Amino acid sequence: MTDLPPADAPVDPELDAAEIEGDESQSEAGGPDESTWRRFDVTSEAGEGLAAAQAAIAAGECIVLPTDTVYGIGSDAFSAASVQRLLDAKERGRDMPPPVLVAEVGMFEALADEIPSHAMRLAQAYWPGALTLIVQAQPHLRMDLGETRGTIAVRVPDHDFTRDLLRRTGPLAVSSANVSGKPSSTNIDDAVGQLGNRVQVYLDGGATPGETPSTIIDFVSTSLGKVVRQGALSLELIHEVAPFVEGIESPEESATLADASEPAGTDPVEAASDAPDEGVDA
């Protein structure tokens, strides 16, 4: 991979907010008109891609980024307008709030309130990785992700480029890079085809491992933990670290549990791991 510039490197001055905003048509349903978005290969154009993505996030725009599960669409988690832009791009309501991706466990501790011991053990064991943890958010946290009811879903992705980006931008609200009800994107062309000029910067990391999303564990309804979506991290591995986490017996139960609890990032439709055509969070 091309050497990455230091995390405190200045943003390219040519990528100012006025240029990033581009055509207002990006806020409407639009096709992949490349005049309003830019694409970067994260291997051969790592530095340029990081700078462009950082500038887009700072300007309140959306980006598409690779993860270790599926491609995600991301925006500034601390900007309500940016999160709404993400939801609009996905044609998704505020009742389906996106999870938050962070670069390291320390940021999880900063965002969450009184993390249960089992949750912290899982984070330390399986992050970076395909595990999303739902916990109570800090009461004074200035995030408006949607109807979270005081919860937050957090993950550290196992993708070097994306974690480096997160160190520069801070926490990002990230959902799967697809229109709700459409297949998840496992390559950048899938994402471009669905989201087009609703996104300012596309970061091409090649094909993802597949359509299986992260496993989601709810630590709000019980401090011991309950799986509300079975994804890439198996229950067997979870039980090696936290043996009392409650599993699920079927994808149908996964959707039912998510519907009943509805904490951040567990949309009842998008939670079902056997229904990739409904779209799933990264």
Residue positions per predicted region:
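Active-site-adjacent structural elements in enzyme catalytic cores
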Residues: T2-A282
